[in-house]
């Protein structure tokens, strides 16, 4: 499911706005049939038919995508990447009960589900998908990359 985000109706621009990037609210299922909520960012200068590498950005534990993950995603989109800031299962716009559960194996799957989603976008270079994990998401991004060969690069920020 894909929806346009207008700056008047979203928290996607809490910390930083960019006139060089478009944003869309999206969602997709993980293998556990839970909806994963995300914000998809693209450079405005992309030409029709052009493919770009993509980066999945995971939020810190105790946070949601509209906080640090969106900032990293927008900044990387300004540098030419397609980016996807995700809410891990049980957090934010993603499904899962009880809320705020910590489940590393499901979180690693959320990164793989994000790679599934990005791989179906006509503007994503499928051989160029990577991940940025902030705080706790750093370990989930590394775990996902260990089992999912589609994740070609991983960067962590303040990983624990």
Go through each PLM region and give its residues.
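N-terminal cap/lid segment of alpha/beta-hydrolase-fold proteins
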Residues: 4-50
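Structural cue for short, hydrophobic secondary-structure segments
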Residues: 57-60, 85
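Active-site glycine-rich loops that stabilize anionic/oxyanionic intermediates
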Residues: 52, 59-64, 135
